[in-house]
Amino acid sequence: MLNNTNVNNGDLVSRVSRQMRISRILIITFFIAYTLITLFPIYALFIRSFVGTKHATDLWLTPPPLEEASMDYQWGSLSVFYNLDSEKAKADLGIPADAYIQSRWTLARIAKEYDIPEQKIKDYFTPYSVYSGWIVLFTDNKFWPALFRTILITGLSLFGLNILSIMTGFGLAGLRRRDQMFVFNLYLLSAVVPLMMILLPQYMIVQWLLNLIPGYGVSGSTIRNVSQIAAIVVLNIKGGALGTMIYTGFISTIPKELGEAAEIDGASILQYFRHIVLPLLKVPIATLTVMVLPSLWNEFMGPYIYLDANNTTLLPLIQSYTGTYTTNYQVSYTGIFVSIIPLIIIYILFRNWFIQGAMSGAIKG
C-alpha cells in the first residue's frame, strides 16, 4: 500500500512539474511573440527608409537591391524624387558651379555636354535608389542643428517642468486650506482646456512679447533664435496640471512629523525642502519624465508655429521634405526613424528608473 502511495505521489509530482514546464513555455512564447509584434513597426520603418518612391506601395521585409541609374533619367526628376542638392551634385561631378542645367536634360546629355564618363554618373546616382533618405538627411546642413535644438528644448522643458511642479506640489501639499484647494482645482481645469481654443490668443500674446525684445525683428539673428526657443520652453512648462497632481499627491504622503522635527532642529523651510523633501522625489520625477518625455520630444505644433524655418526642430524639418506634387518617402521614413533613436537610447539607459516610477505611480504606500 505504501509503495502504491509513493508511486501515485510521484506521478502527481511529475504531472504538476510537466504542466508547469508547459505553462512556462507558453508564457515565454507569448512574450516573445508580443515583443516581436511590438518591435515589428520599428523594423518596418527602418526597412521603409531604403524603399524609394517607385516602390512605395510594395511591402518589403528586407532592403531592396540597388538599381543602376539609367542615363535616361532627367535632371529635374532626380532633383524632385531624390531631394537632390543640385549645387553639391554639380560640384561632385565636376560641373562648373555657374553652369545652367535644364530640368529636362537627361544624364546622357549632361555626360556629353560636360565630358563626364557615363560610369561616373551611374556610380554617383545609383546609391540614391536605396540610400536617398540617409544621404539627403545626413548631408543636409539643417539636420544636426535641428536635432540639437530638439534635445535642448526637450531637456530644458523637462527640467523646468519638474522644478515648477515640485515647487507647486510642495506649496499645495496637504490641501489643508481652502485657497490651496482653489489653486489646485485651477491647475486641474487647465488640463481640460483644448489647445486649439487658446492657440490664437496665445500666439498673439507670445508674438507681442517677443517683439518687445530689442533685435528680435532681425531675421536669423541670435537674439531672435534664442527668444523663440525660450518661448517654446516657457509654453511647455506653464500650467503643468499633470506634474502638479503627481507631486502634490506624493508630497502629501510625507509624514508631517518630518517637517516638525526639522523645524525643531532649527531648519528653515528651504532647508527642509532641499535636504528632506527633494531626496524623496526620485520616483515622482521618473514618473513625470516617462509620461511627458515622448510628447515633448515629438512636439510638432509649437515649433512649427513659433520657430523660423532655419531655427526649427526635427519634426517640422522632416515635414518640410514633403513636396507639393511628390514626396521622397525615403527621407520622411529615415527622418522619423532617426528621431525615435534618441528616445529608445534614453529608455534603455534609464529603464530601471522609469520602470520604478511607472510601477509606483508616484504614490507612496
Map each language-model feature to its residues:
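Short, solvent-exposed alpha-helical "recognition" segments
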Residues: 95-101, 283
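A hydrophobic, multi-pass inner-membrane permease signature
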Residues: 2-70, 77, 81, 91, ...
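Compact, charge-rich alpha-helical regulatory domains located at protein termini
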Residues: 73-77, 100-105
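Amphipathic, charged-and-aliphatic alpha-helical interface segments
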Residues: 87-97
